[in-house]
A protein has these predicted regions:
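Conserved lysine of the Walker
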Residues: 176
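N-terminal pre-P-loop "Q-motif" helix
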Residues: 135-164
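C-terminal accessory regions
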Residues: 276, 424-522
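Conserved helicase/translocase motor-coupling segment
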Residues: 180, 286-291, 305-329, 336-454
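Conserved RecA-like ASCE ATPase "motif II neighborhood" in helicase/translocase motors
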Residues: 213-271, 423-427, 487
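Accessory nucleic-acid engagement/destabilization modules that flank
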Residues: 1-110
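Signature of the SF2 helicase/ATPase Hel1-core->accessory helical subdomain module
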Residues: 244-310, 314
């Protein structure tokens, strides 16, 4: 194993499952499992059962012990000591210290394993204290209306025991995730078994850090409330009271390693009495993304879940891009996403949008914003190879004017909130669902402008051969075109205060520059 000095100090790098991977420290794993049981097991509370976590690594070699006992892990090793191959005696003494006699009924493990899973009062209070009073999670306008409707629907489900599914639609910056976290808090406060679900880990990690202010103990205490759809196929029917599925447009049929998985939309609906899907179909960015309204409707009919989709479940008000619907319309216009062009009034747009001719100048301008304490990140589409990951070179993104940068592949889970991540370029998977003060978008050769036909053109062949996730290179032309446009719309709408753009295609650069000079015009 090898120490990984991330900002939370709970990971190690090791060779497992035929690959070099970053995994959780065993003491952290043991402690996190004990937190889950304390927070959810009714039996532990009722029977006054104590939990003492530890880790036994029966095959871990003594010469590597110093790696796991590195001082940066002392918080976790203090809470859950670990024992290795030649420490059987010490491990035995530790167990004997805390287990002195047989439980009175002899069924202690059975009680824990078969006990009712419900959030404890301590977990309810912990989550509520993090959300309430946190300005990042205040509900506004139609968010509050939708929130109230979701609470009433949950009450109805509990009353008549009938499955229901709510679809909440909203474009970029309409507050879908804020609504989702508030719903999670309220359902947990009602002692309901609920979880916040996203396919991608980046939004989960970001909200965990935001809620806990990166306090390691607080984070591990609520981490089990934020989960992946992975392995939901093993869940009992209505095993959850509610699953709140954010970024639902990114759901897929199955993830690698989820051998029992069939369809994540189906599995979310099947596993919960009430399933809530928050989505934006225009943000589907790979050929595997299946979280559409039609897909959800199909599985509702199949599984007997009543579908709720109405005016109250549509979020329209814009809280990103300085609250400007005009900017979102402007992005749609320059990407020519609609057949009919519309007039976009940018005269009162209080949003810092710039197009740069030099990628180094754009990075320098963004770096200044970042140093001024504005949360700033650089992002790009699928065009650039993963040279560093595959040991083919020192740089991934190489542009004119000797611009060089790396992808964020090493620490993609925390890239959005790690203050040291500015110099790395984020991909769609780590940026989607998140927001920054300023975002810099590198538009590659997959998107160009034809001045003769005055049209935006996409080029699936420009997608990197290292891209094994989007499926764009082998997609049908129309599908590839849609996914490329969706990708750039998503990236261009990550900023709250500003968006800086560099285009590899000179004609596209000029087209966008001319577009923003006209305050109101059919582009």
């Amino acid at each position: 194993a090898e120490v990984v000095a991330d900002d939370m100090h709970y990971c190690v790098r090791t060779y497992v499952a035929n690959s070099d991977r970053i995994v959780c420290h065993p003491s952290y794993q043991a402690y996190s499992y004990s937190c889950f049981l304390r927070n959810y097991s009714q039996s532990l509370t009722d029977e006054d059962i104590s939990l003492i976590p530890c880790a036994y690594l029966h095959n871990y070699q003594p010469e590597y012990r110093q790696t796991l006992s590195n001082p940066i892990y002392k918080e976790w090793t203090g809470l859950a000591p670990f024992f290795i191959k030649n420490e059987v005696g010490a491990f035995s003494d530790f167990v004997k210290k805390y287990i002195t006699k047989k439980s009175s009924k002899g069924d202690l493990l059975y009680l824990i394993d078969h006990g009712r899973l419900r959030p404890t009062k301590a977990l309810q209070d912990s989550l509520a204290s993090m959300v309430k009073g946190n300005k990042e999670f205040m509900l506004l306008d139609e968010q509050a209306v939708c929130f109230d409707m979701c609470l009433k629907t949950m009450s109805q489900c509990l009353k008549d025991k009938k499955k229901r599914t709510i679809i909440i639609q909203g474009g970029p910056g309409t507050g879908k995730s804020v609504l989702a976290v508030n719903l999670l808090m309220e359902y947990i406060n009602q002692s309901l078994n609920a979880s916040y679900v996203t396919k991608n880990s980046a939004p989960r990690e970001a909200f965990l850090r935001l809620l806990t202010k990166s306090d390691a103990k607080k984070l591990v205490n609520i981490k089990q409330l934020f989960r992946s759809p992975f392995n939901l196929s093993k869940c009992d029917i209505n095993g959850y009271d509610c699953l709140i599925v954010d970024e639902a447009h990114r759901l897929v049929k199955k993830m690698y390693g989820d051998w029992n998985g069939e369809n994540q939309v189906k599995e979310c609906i099947n596993a919960s009495l009430l399933s809530i899907f928050l989505l934006d179909e225009d943000q589907a960015v790979t050929t595997k993304d299946i979280g559409s309204i039609d897909e959800i409707r199909h599985w509702c009919e199949t599984l007997g879940s009543r579908l709720v989709i109405k005016d109250e479940t549509k979020l329209i008000s814009q809280f990103r891009c300085n609250g400007s619907d005009a900017y979102i319309q402007f992005v749609d216009e320059i990407l020519q996403r609609h057949e009919e062009s519309i007039a976009v009034d940018l005269s009162e747009l209080n949003f810092d949008f710039r197009v740069f001719d030099n990628p180094n100048e754009m990075r320098d301008a963004l770096r200044v914003k970042n140093l001024e304490n504005h949360k700033t990140r650089m992002v790009a589409g699928y065009c650039y190879d993963w040279n560093v990951k595959h040991r083919r070179g020192d740089w991934d993104v190489m542009l004119e004017d000797n611009f060089k940068a790396k992808w964020n592949l090493e620490n993609d889970k925390v890239w959005a909130i790690n203050p040291d991540s500015f110099e790395e370029i984020g991909c769609i998977h780590t940026a989607q669902g998140l927001e920054f003060d300023y975002v810099g978008v590198f538009i590659g050769k997959d998107l160009t402008y034809n001045p003769v036909t005055r049209s935006i053109e996409t080029h699936r062949e420009a997608i990197s051969n290292d891209d094994n996730s989007s499926g764009i290179r082998s997609a049908a032309p129309a599908k590839a075109h849609q996914l490329i446009l969706n990708t750039y719309k998503t990236l261009l709408t990550r900023g709250q205060k500003g968006c800086y753009v560099y285009c590899e295609d000179h004609a596209l650069r000029r087209y966008i520059s001319l577009s923003i000079k006209v305050l109101s015009r059919n582009l």
